[in-house]
Structures are given as structure tokens and as C-alpha cells.
Amino acid sequence: MSLRFTKMHGLGNDFVVIDAIRQSVDLTPEQVRRLADRHFGIGCDQLLVVEEATRPDVDFRYRIFNADGGEVEQCGNGARCFVRFVHEQGLTAKRRIRVETRSGIIAPQLEDDGLVTVDMGVPVLEPARVPFVSDSDAIVQPLDVGGETVAITAVSMGNPHAVQVVADVDAAPVAAQGALIERHPRFPARVNAGFVQVVDAHRIRLRVFERGAGETLACGTGACAAVVTVILRELAQSPVRVETRGGELDIAWEGPGQPVLMTGPAVTVFAGEIDVD
């Protein structure tokens, strides 16, 4: 099977984007893993699939597959690339679209300055809906990680995040703790592990160990979850600029019950065609 694709990135968080509207696409988890392999495939953190909408009130369906082949609910950096892709490919003339994901509706918009703003929806804080096993609704929760107790905030941005505040994000044990937190039994759907350093009231630094992908250069939903965390803990105020290893995102959130707005770049790198067997 020959497959046309486009390679894109949002702050170095890179994607293989596939149009499943104008070509037939039915990938197995093993095929996704091969495409995502940086030595034997194209290479990416996630593979994004553009499909026709299944309901009349949205423009497209957006599916996300991690590099390990598993399908996940949401990807913020990918959402920015998604709207740029469908616009550049002539699949829509709209600059603002409504997109269905496994976790609900998002609304990305191409801005005049070339950046993309995405309404990421209202963050979920109730532990059972994250999902996170806890008998408390406290914002800060203790979590045993390899015999050490760390303080985390559990947030879902359509996908689950465990965010901890650290003094120095460069020295944070992202690889060691991130792998343990990702598969912690209190997160039955696994989780993305965020490590955030507060610089001042409107700036934070962030690293994220992503579920199914490991540490990436940037994580859009992770940035949203981190901003929700520091605002809830009264360590920062909206809007917040988030520094990642791949670049910066601007996040605005006015508090519980309100949607999170994320603004950042989306870049097309190259397009190609690959044989998938």
C-alpha cells in the first residue's frame, strides 16, 4: 500500500499527518510503529489522521496515534498542525474549524500572524474523570513514585496529565520518574507526566514525559495542564507563556469551568509517499 503523508511539527513535537479523506487508510498498530520509527520509517512522536466528520456540526474527525501504535484521545500541538494541514491541502477554506476527537470537540483557528489558536475545552479536574484513583478532590495530591512521595495535580485536557511543580526543570528526573508515573496504577489509562518550574506570575518552564512516546520537545495538552495547575495553586496568573525545549506557547485560562486557549506555531516540513506493507 502506497501512502501519501506530510511531516509537520509544533515546537519540535513532530507528526506524520495522513489525509484519509482522499486516500484509503487502514493502519495496524504495527504499521503505525514502523512509520513512527526514526531509523526504519519516517519518524514522529505521533501520527495524525484526517478523516471525514461523523456528525453534522463539525468539519473533520481527528485521530491520534502515539509512536507505540496506541490510539489516544488528544494532542494539542497536533491540533495546531491539523488545522494548518487541512487548510494548506485545500480540504477547507475556513480558518476556524470544529474538529471531533475521541475526547470531544476542539476548535483550532489560523491567526493572521501565522500562529494557531486552539480552544482546548474545559479542563477536567474530578479525579474519577481524569481518570485518577483518589478519595480526595484536593488540587495537590500525594503520589508514591519509586518509594518517594511527590505532590501532583491530576488534570485531563482530553488526555490525562500528572503535573508536579519543581524548583529546576533542567534537574528534574523526567526520564526516571516520568516512566514510573506514566504507568502508575493510580492512573488506570496511563498518564502524561509534567514537570513545571514557575519563573514568574506569567511565565513557566515545562518538560513532559508523554504517554507512549517518552519525553518530547513540547506537549500542547501538557502545557495547558501545567498552566491550569499553577493557576489553581495560585503560583501564576493568566495569560501564561510556557517555555518548552522546542519553543514557546501562550496559554490563557480564566479559571474552573472556562476553556483553555492555546496559541503557538504549526510548521510543515516536507511531504512524501511511502510504501506500507
UniProtKB/Swiss-Prot annotation:
Please give the Gene3D superfamilies that the UniProt record associates with this protein: Diaminopimelate Epimerase, Chain A, domain 1
- Principal location class: cytoplasm
Q: What is its subcellular localisation? A: Cytoplasm
Q: In which pathway does it act?
A: Amino-acid biosynthesis; L-lysine biosynthesis via DAP pathway; DL-2,6-diaminopimelate from LL-2,6-diaminopimelate: step 1/1
Show the catalytic activity: (2S,6S)-2,6-diaminopimelate = meso-2,6-diaminopimelate
Entry keyword Lipid biosynthesis: no
For the protein in the UniProt heading, the enzyme class is isomerase
What Pfam families does this protein's entry cite? DAP_epimerase
State the function annotated in the UniProt record.
Catalyzes the stereoinversion of LL-2,6-diaminopimelate (L,L-DAP) to meso-diaminopimelate (meso-DAP), a precursor of L-lysine and an essential component of the bacterial peptidoglycan.
For the site labelled Could be important to modulate the pK values of the two catalytic cysteine residues, the residues are 161, 210
- Give the matching SUPFAM superfamilies: Diaminopimelate epimerase-like
Record carries keyword Isomerase:
yes
Any single GO CC term annotated in Swiss-Prot or TrEMBL for this entry:
cytosol
Name the family the entry cites.
Belongs to the diaminopimelate epimerase family.
**SUBUNIT field:** Homodimer.
Q: What is its EC number?
A: 5.1.1.7
Q: Which UniProt keywords apply?
A: Amino-acid biosynthesis, Cytoplasm, Isomerase, Lysine biosynthesis
Provide the protein name.
Diaminopimelate epimerase
Binding-site positions, substrate: 13, 46, 66, 76-77, 159, 192, 210-211, 220-221
Originating organism: Aromatoleum aromaticum (strain DSM 19018 / LMG 30748 / EbN1) (Azoarcus sp. (strain EbN1))
